């Protein structure tokens, strides 16, 4: 366990519980000293003022220190590092190069977060015990409830920016060839609310046209901006016809230029 100063007690307990359930050794440690040493070198040796840094600088330092330690552990034991990013995180670049993006194989890189929720439940049922802590899995009824919300825990009160379930489905459909303009037209006509997206659109407040457009633009532009991370993901164990590594990608900032008129119409409706 490579604990940061921001790790919750629940996270530490979950790590111990999982190790116990699988019968594997857990080594507990903290990366705080290395993080502070990195800050000191940048400030005292190179003259940077950490009060002027965006928070992402220290978040990435923590992730890269973890990557460094994992690589060192692997070298000591004659092993390798396995990547733990899921498909949505890879798509949106929600990882740090040379940090949590390292590894020789990405076994779950073709699984969305929702796939992993379902797989975790199947594992618990198969083993007839709590292997994957239940507090990590959401309860979905007329709402979604998290006992332990997904978080990188690299700063205080940090939560994942993704709208889980909705963004998982949107990514799957876009990668499977869904026409984004047809998707927007279905939203305009309200047809989208009658299908698989309806529940999640309402749950996340995306029945508000302005919020919908804001989220769609964020998602699609983030997807395009992070092509360079998608290309540098370790080899992915393919479970679908469209895993990253087999998809031609384009680095850019544009939000599907062919959809700009539709997005404007939805916003002004």
Region annotations inferred by a language model:
Residues 1-269:
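ATP/NTP-dependent adenylation/nucleotidyl-transfer catalytic domains that generate, transfer
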């Amino acid at each position: 366990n490579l604990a940061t100063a921001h790790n919750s007690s629940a996270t530490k307990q979950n790590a111990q519980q999982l190790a116990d359930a699988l019968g594997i050794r857990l080594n507990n440690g903290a990366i705080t000293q290395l993080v502070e040493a990195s800050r000191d070198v940048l400030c005292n040796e190179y003259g940077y003022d950490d009060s002027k840094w965006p928070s992402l600088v220290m978040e990435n330092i923590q992730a890269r220190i973890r990557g460094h330690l994992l690589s060192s552990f692997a070298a000591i034991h004659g092993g390798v590092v396995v990547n733990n990013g899921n498909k949505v995180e890879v798509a949106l670049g929600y990882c740090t190069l040379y940090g949590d993006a390292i590894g020789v194989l990405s076994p779950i890189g073709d699984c969305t977060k929702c796939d992993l929720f379902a797989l975790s439940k199947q594992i618990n049922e198969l083993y007839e015990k709590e292997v994957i802590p239940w507090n990590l899995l959401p309860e979905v009824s007329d709402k979604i409830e998290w006992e332990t919300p997904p978080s990188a825990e690299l700063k205080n009160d940090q939560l994942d920016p993704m709208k889980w379930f909705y963004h998982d489905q949107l990514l799957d459909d876009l990668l499977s060839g869904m026409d984004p303009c047809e998707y927007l037209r279905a939203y305009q006509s309200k047809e989208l609310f009658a299908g698989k997206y309806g529940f999640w659109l309402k749950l996340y407040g995306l029945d508000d046209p302005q919020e919908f457009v804001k989220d769609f633009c964020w998602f699609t532009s983030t997807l395009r901006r992070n092509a360079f991370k998608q290309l540098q993901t370790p080899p992915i164990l393919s479970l679908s016809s469209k895993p990253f590594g087999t998809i031609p990608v384009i680095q850019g900032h544009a939000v599907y230029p062919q959809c700009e008129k539709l997005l404007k119409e939805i916003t002004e409706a």
